Amino acid sequence: MKKIIFAFIILFVFLLPMIIFYQPWVNALPSTPRHASPEQLEKTVRYLTQTVHPRSADNIDNLNRSAEYIKEVFVSSGARVTSQDVPITGGPYKNIVADYGPADGPLIIIGAHYDSASSYENDQLTYTPGADDNASGVAGLLELARLLHQQVPKTGVQLVAYASEEPPFFRSDEMGSAVHAASLERPVKLMIALEMIGYYDSAPGSQNYPYPAMSWLYPDRGDFIAVVGRIQDINAVRQVKAALLSSQDLSVYSMNTPGFIPGIDFSDHLNYWQHDIPAIMITDTAFYRNKQYHLPGDTADRLNYQKMAQVVDGVITLLYNSK
């Protein structure tokens, strides 16, 4: 009997972290009849990566053209639209904020940064088109705007396009999301960062992880979308995962881990944690899958717009089901 009890204790010790970390049992929400347009997603990505390329910190004119494009889409969706200054030398840098639903009460915030990275390669400055990082997230944000125009949400929803996430601003007070998070006056139920949602690869071995042992729980093919949060964000992650699972052809995996795990805080959601706001990231896992991360090869033709649309469908399902 003691051996049986000991075996159960060992099993519990191993299973409990796995259940918290991996969340294998989540029921899908009913899907919404309204759907994102893969064609419109591609149109937005191509505009951001070709017409206003590069969108890096040293190309302020292209950043401002991107901001105007985003603002026009938000306005046409019937939102209450404002511009928020991000105080950075050499600006103006602007967050574009769109509000839907009730003008007071708690909010759900969906955010994506519209800037792209630059880097030195062989002592020469190079620019990425930033299709996956992060024109894909912005395209998702603008499709959400179009869908929210068709049906006003019952809860307050705020869509935010951030001006500055990439280096040299990352992890600084000059991140657009840091400025936005510090300015909030309404209570926030949930913040979601759309960070690289467009690249998928079904080849064996195409998916990597911060630690090799994670491959015991997660696929080796990069054909899924991930929902990522801290341990204390477990309810938020479950809620978002359930909504994404409403897209039946979309493979969804989730992860709740301590903040020190590499990759867990690699986007704008990290700035909301400082204000005790539940905040999670929806991502294709960035450089753990996409080998053109921050490189010139991050182009529009490499993205899967059907899967991107399924991700947006999941997020709009969440918003329509929130009260």
UniProtKB/Swiss-Prot annotation:
Biological process (GO), any one: proteolysis
Subcellular location: Membrane
InterPro entries noted in UniProt: M28_fam, Peptidase_M28
Primary localisation category: membrane
GO cellular-component term (any): membrane
Membrane topology: Single-pass membrane protein
Keywords: Membrane, Transmembrane, Transmembrane helix
A Pfam family matched in the record: Peptidase_M28
Gene3D superfamilies for the chain: Zn peptidases
Any one GO molecular function term: metalloexopeptidase activity
Keyword Nuclease part of the UniProt annotation: no
Signal peptide per UniProt: none
SUPFAM superfamilies documented for this protein: Zn-dependent exopeptidases
Protein name: Uncharacterized protein YfbL
